[in-house]
Amino acid sequence: MEQNTDNVFNFSAGPAALPKPVMQQAQQELLNWQGLGTSVMEISHRSKEFIAVAEQSEQDLRDLLNIPDNYKVLFCQGGARAQFAAVPLNLLGDATTATYIDAGYWAESAVEEAKKYCQPDVFVAKAEKDGKQAVLPASEWQIHPDAAYVHFCPNETIDGIEINDLPVTDKPIVADMSSTILSREIDVSKYGVIYAGAQKNIGPSGIAIAIVRDDLLGLAKEVLPSILNYKVLAEQDSMFNTPPTFAWYLSGLVFKWLKAQGGVKAIEQVNREKAAILYNYIDESDFYINNVHPDNRSLMNVPFQMVKPELDAKFLKEAEALGLKSLKGHRVVGGMRASIYNAMPIEGVKALVDFMRQFEQENA
């Protein structure tokens, strides 16, 4: 039996929910885009029509994040994992090390890839505070004096841990913002490189964004594949080869949708309200638990467990039947996880809390 999509809320960590108006527009335009009689998926990436899409999407992203002129915006392939290799190969220059801040799974994944190209200096920032998971403040991070850059992941999706501050350093700061980009205001000028896989707050999977400061172009090692070379991509307007045009087009629609919501400042307020609704209920409950200290709780990914973990399967089955999708926690930590990215409306979070309250009453 088909579910009414009006009552379905997708809490997937990624690929994540896309704004419904974006999907509706893509559906309407799918077979005949801009009166061309063909789909946007079928036209040349070199055509004037698609060049206009590419240029407008870049400008919209620049507007949303207030990206300074001395930064290049690159639309890349291979997702964030490709950037785990691209970052050291583009930025090391003659250096043999870079500092990596380890606060969770994705930071550790970046370290493992970097080991192929250098000897990463790893600072473990994981901590415990009041019996909860936390992260050491950036002022306590130890940065190697010879580091080519400092890499960190501001939001660890699996544990639901967020880093909210930056170190004071003369080293370029590199951030994997796959799960936080466009969810709150940031000062791009404080970073050397920001990269993000698209499939959470930007668009569908298949594309990634890299925002690179101009002075960091041209440091690439000779062995770096051209498709990962920031300078090559910048010189070729991200079209060194055929890009994932449909994902690029959809990302552009998401940027326009976000501007129509009032931009990043407005969506940040909504995101904070959504997270507060969910965390407040969990904290008030004796049935649900979140193991992250409030100082480091993620705005985007809210993991929670029940005091009766044997009820997990029942919880997930009943939630699914009500249209509350993809709430199963990551296999590493178990339990449940609600990913509440930009496209998740407040109504979805309220529907989840209503279900959680009812489930608690029936099963406590």
Curated annotation (Swiss-Prot):
Enzymatic reactions: O-phospho-L-serine + 2-oxoglutarate = 3-phosphooxypyruvate + L-glutamate; 4-(phosphooxy)-L-threonine + 2-oxoglutarate = (R)-3-hydroxy-2-oxo-4-phosphooxybutanoate + L-glutamate
| Any one GO biological process | L-serine biosynthetic process
State its cofactor. pyridoxal 5'-phosphate
Subcellular location per the Swiss-Prot or TrEMBL entry: Cytoplasm
**Gene3D superfamilies found in the cross-reference section:** Aspartate Aminotransferase, domain 1 (3.90.1150.10), Type I PLP-dependent aspartate aminotransferase-like (Major domain) (3.40.640.10)
Residues where pyridoxal 5'-phosphate binds: A80, R81, W106, T157, D176, Q199, N241, T242
A single Pfam family it belongs to is Aminotran_5
The molecule here is called Phosphoserine aminotransferase
Q: Which organism does this sequence originate in?
A: Vibrio vulnificus (strain YJ016)
Q: Which gene encodes it?
A: serC
